[in-house]
Amino acid sequence: MTHQSRQTRACLLSLGGGRPGSSVDLQNMEDSGPDRRGSVFAGLVGASQVLGLVSVVITGVWMGHYRGGFAWDGSAREFNLHPLCMVLGLVLLHGDAILVYRVFSNEAKKKVKLLHGTIHLLALITSIVGVVAVFDFHSASLIPHLYSLHSWGGLTTLILFSSQWVMGLLFFLFPGASSWLRATYLPIHVFCGLTLLVMAIGTSLLGITEKLLFSIESSYPQFTPEGVLANILGVFLVLFGVLLCYLVTREEYRRPPNPEEEALSVHFKTLTEGGAPATP
């Protein structure tokens, strides 16, 4: 063992009171640290994907089996595309786009950015299809547009989601934005992404309740299979959101620093604490 290694071990042992079996013992740190966190992380990511995919499947079964299937003809079957597209787009794909920075934390940042933006684009397209479907149905059935809290929340979420995607494209994928501009917008972008996911799930819960009251209001209190299935969908959506927020906000799951991120941090610190940046 080199002199430097002996000094390092002595320092670690001194922090634990000199006891080899203490919580800061070097061997224990090596044995129980990253591997254990990695396995927990993988399990949580897997659980989130199961919850998200099952939510989409439940929505498809609900609309396909209990509500008559899917079509693009202005009928109620066209409306059935709305919940399916919104759960797939604004919830599952949106959540997965956020999660790629944790799952692919060791990949090149540019590749992860492209994947993040591409999944968000797919989520946006899918959600627009869902909104067009419900507007078509309302027009064909002479139902007023945008009168419910669900519709207000859904349209607001979609507009903000679209704006979020455009702003992310301008600030992080196009090379025009300076480092200090990106550093200023980065925490806003992260906060808005999670907020929009919460808004999407909350609006979905409103939509589930609204659909049940319109479709099976009289039998809903009798725990009919359709009502129970829709309630389970709501629970799964909430659990998906909780897991996503947990994975994204835990410090140990954050992407390891790289030169680009360190530069952003320097600029952000300069903006918030004052002083001149070390680099232009």
Predicted regions mapped to residue ranges:
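Polytopic transmembrane helical bundles with strong interfacial aromatic enrichment
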Residues: 2, 7, 36, 40-46
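Hydrophobic alpha-helical cores of multi-pass transmembrane domains in eukaryotic membrane proteins
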Residues: 47-61, 80-98, 115-132, 152-170, ...
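Membrane-helix exit/interface motif
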Residues: 62-68, 95-106, 129-144, 167-177
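Juxtamembrane loop segments immediately following a transmembrane helix
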Residues: 163-188, 198-225
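Non-transmembrane, juxtamembrane loop and terminal tail segments
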Residues: 2-33, 256-280
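Juxtamembrane membrane-interface segments at transmembrane-helix boundaries in membrane proteins
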Residues: 29-42, 68-85, 113, 140-153, ...
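Membrane-proximal N-terminal segments immediately preceding the first transmembrane helix
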Residues: 2-3, 12-37, 56-72, 94-102, ...
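Transmembrane-helix exit/juxtamembrane "anchor" motif
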Residues: 98-102, 170-177, 242-261
